[in-house]
UniProtKB/Swiss-Prot annotation:
Belongs to the ZIP transporter (TC 2.A.5) family. It holds the Pfam family Zip. Signal peptide: none annotated. The lineage of its organism: Eukaryota, Metazoa, Chordata, Craniata, Vertebrata. Transporter for the divalent cation Zn(2+). Mediates the influx of Zn(2+) into cells from extracellular space. This is Zinc transporter ZIP1. Residues 52-68, 126-179, 228-237, 294-303 are cytoplasmic. Residues 1-30, 90-104, 201-206, 259-272 are extracellular. The keyword Transferase does not apply.
Length: 324
């Protein structure tokens, strides 16, 4: 109604509607984001391999490089801790709550936390089965009959022996290789889901914001992942292969999201959330029982390691805050 009680004429103005409606997400924008994410993440994954895997000229240079790698790995540990607590967990909890609300499901049972626990126990059971099988293959030496977390009577200095360095019995290298695989898998799966968020996006402005945030986030994570794998004494070829795999996951998610944009529904979202919850549970295990204990177990440069750990946490925290 008009100001004098007269009915107003409803006139459709195309220019006004176009200014209020979100700009549709074009296929070329998604393809550009896909290629850019692939190239940048791949470069960030391979740079640590090229820089830190050069053969040392003498034992002193090799020892110095190992100390530097340990310090940088503490920084990466802070990045992983922030990724676990401030990125993976909130994304998973928000997505599964949204999916359950869309399906009009009300739960009395803590399903979200149960899925996290299942992901946690999945890695634990796999590691224990692998370790038990390796121990039954032959009597391990006395120094290898230690707990899975690397704490023995001999002190914490034996921790790094279990990070992929070949041993006589081979019992300690198997859990380390498994943990490395689980770490890559959990990050790769989460990257697919982050790519899905871009691929399913129909608002171009929002999609560009997501792509920019992912570029920064994935670049930092790619460097941290390569440092983590190098610290596990894996071969450079294996680390490079894991970096390539990780680099392809977010573009894969963008492609899948683009293809499924028209058919995405609450059931699809619920299934995706369950998988993401399992991945978050595995990442919880790797973060708190592998990455942080290993870096803080040795007695060298404790204060500097804590500072670098906090710096890595603060860096990703600031990045996530900027996204808000």
């Amino acid at each position: 109604m008009g100001p004098w009680g007269e009915p107003e004429l409803l006139v459709w103005r195309p220019e006004a509607a176009a200014s209020e409606a979100p700009v549709p997400m074009g296929l070329e924008v998604k393809l550009g984001a896909l290629v850019l994410l692939l190239v940048l993440t791949l470069i960030c994954s391979l740079v640590p391999v090229c820089v830190l895997r050069r053969p040392g000229a003498n034992p002193e240079a090799s020892a110095s490089r190992q100390k530097a790698l340990s310090l940088v790995s503490c920084f990466a540990g802070g990045v992983f801790l922030a990724t676990c607590l401030l990125d993976l967990l909130p994304d998973y909890l928000g997505a599964i709550d949204e999916a359950l609300a869309a399906l009009h499901v009300t739960l009395q049972f803590p399903l979200q936390e149960f899925i996290l626990a299942m992901g946690f126990f999945l890695v634990l059971v796999m590691e224990q089965i692998t370790l038990a099988y390796k121990e039954q293959s032959g009597p391990p030496p006395r120094e290898e009959t230690r707990a899975l977390l690397g704490t023995v009577n001999g002190g914490p200095q034996h921790w790094h022996d279990g990070l992929g360095v070949p041993q006589a019995g081979g019992a300690s290298s198997a859990p380390s290789a498994l943990r490395a695989c689980v770490l890559v898998f959990s990050l790769a799966l989460h990257s697919v889901f982050e790519g899905l968020a871009v691929g399913l996006q129909r608002d171009q402005a929002r999609a560009m914001e997501l792509c920019l945030a992912l570029l920064l986030h994935k670049g930092i994570l790619a460097v941290s992942l390569s440092l983590r794998l190098l610290q596990s004494h894996l071969r450079a070829q294996v680390v490079a292969g894991c970096g390539i795999l990780f680099s392809c996951m977010t573009p894969l998610g963008i492609g899948l999201g683009t293809a499924l944009a028209e058919s995405a529904g609450p059931l699809h979202q619920l299934a995706q959330s369950v998988l993401e919850g399992m991945a978050a549970g595995t990442f919880l295990y790797i973060t708190f029982l592998e990455i942080l204990p290993q870096e803080l177990a040795t007695s060298e440069q404790r204060i500097l390691k804590v500072i670098l750990l906090l710096a890595g946490f603060a860096l990703l925290t600031g990045l996530l805050f900027i996204q808000i």
